[in-house]
């Protein structure tokens, strides 16, 4: 008689707060992991972009150059460059090591909500409230975009460089007044979304059922980022960023 195969263990979801960063940049508009998950970027309403080691809570560098609040940022795949966009309608290319502005791209008619590099970090894609996506050549000195996509009928809130498709819609979280993030967990088993009710919602990707409503705090969870390979979640609320891990995780030196 053959025994049945054991049921695969389900993924562990981050439910334990292990670190809180007081970012000191006014309201944190976005938080983003770098490509390997060792560092994160925070975008502030005080016009700054900051680079952190999130598990240690260490501030590594502050980037100043925007004329208004910073709304999104992304790192290149080789960790040498950053790009950011903000309320000043500008897209900024940064050198990570020196903290200097390499290029400023202008052309959007409204605030820039979202930015992404292509895989080679030769092109920046930016999405704006002006309903356009613009592609900027990082290697050329030409000031105008190499391509403009203006078929959208409303403001662009998110741009992703991917070959994936939209699989399903998930309802239940509250989203009326703010541009809120959503992403996939590190094993692509759950859709994770911010909410205006102070919680982060985890939805089973296949079933579409709510797996977890994680209470973060009394405010709006405006942004989140999921570690690329580990059950580690960053959330942004007010002027701080919270780092969450699975229940079994033991932080070095304890939680703070």
Question: Where in the sequence are the language-model features?
Answer:
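Terminal intrinsically disordered, low-complexity extensions flanking WD-repeat/beta-propeller proteins
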Residues: 3-9, 168-180, 187-189, 198, ...
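Short C-terminal beta-strands that terminate individual repeats in beta-propeller domains
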Residues: 9-11, 17-23, 59-65, 101-107, ...
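Canonical WD40 repeat/beta-propeller blade segments in eukaryotic WD-repeat proteins
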Residues: 26-32, 68-75, 110-117, 154-161, ...
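WD40-repeat beta-propellers
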Residues: 31, 49-52, 91-95, 115, ...
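Residue-level detector of Asp-centered blade-edge/turn motifs that repeat once per structural unit
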Residues: 35-36, 77-78, 119-120, 162-163, ...
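Conserved strand-to-loop turn within each blade of WD40 beta-propeller repeats
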Residues: 42-46, 84-88, 127-130, 194-197, ...
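A conserved positional marker within WD40/Gbeta-like beta-propeller blades
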Residues: 48, 67, 81, 90, ...
């Amino acid at each position: 008689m053959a025994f049945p195969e054991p049921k695969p263990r389900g993924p562990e979801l981050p439910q334990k707060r292990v670190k809180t960063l007081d970012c000191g940049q006014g309201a944190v508009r976005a938080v983003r992991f770098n490509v390997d998950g060792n560092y994160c970027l925070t975008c502030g309403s005080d016009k700054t972009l900051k680079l952190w080691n999130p598990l240690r809570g260490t501030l590594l560098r502050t980037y100043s150059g925007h004329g208004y609040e910073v709304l999104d940022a992304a790192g290149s795949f080789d960790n040498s460059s950053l790009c950011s966009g903000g309320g000043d309608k500008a897209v900024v290319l940064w050198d990570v090591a020196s903290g200097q502005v390499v290029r400023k791209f202008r052309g959007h008619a409204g605030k820039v909500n979202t930015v992404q590099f292509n895989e080679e970090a030769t092109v920046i894609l930016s999405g704006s409230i002006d309903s356009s996506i613009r592609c900027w050549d990082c290697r050329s000195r030409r000031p105008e975009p190499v391509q403009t996509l203006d078929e959208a009928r409303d403001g662009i809130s998110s741009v992703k460089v991917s070959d994936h498709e939209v699989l399903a819609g998930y309802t239940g979280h509250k989203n009326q007044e703010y541009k809120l993030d959503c992403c996939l967990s590190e094993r692509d088993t759950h859709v994770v979304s911010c909410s205006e009710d102070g919680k982060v919602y985890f939805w089973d990707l296949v079933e579409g059922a709510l797996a977890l409503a994680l209470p973060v705090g009394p405010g709006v969870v405006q942004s989140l980022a999921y570690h690329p390979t580990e059950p580690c979640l960053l959330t942004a609320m007010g002027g701080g960023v919270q780092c969450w891990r699975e229940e079994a995780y033991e932080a070095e030196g304890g939680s703070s």
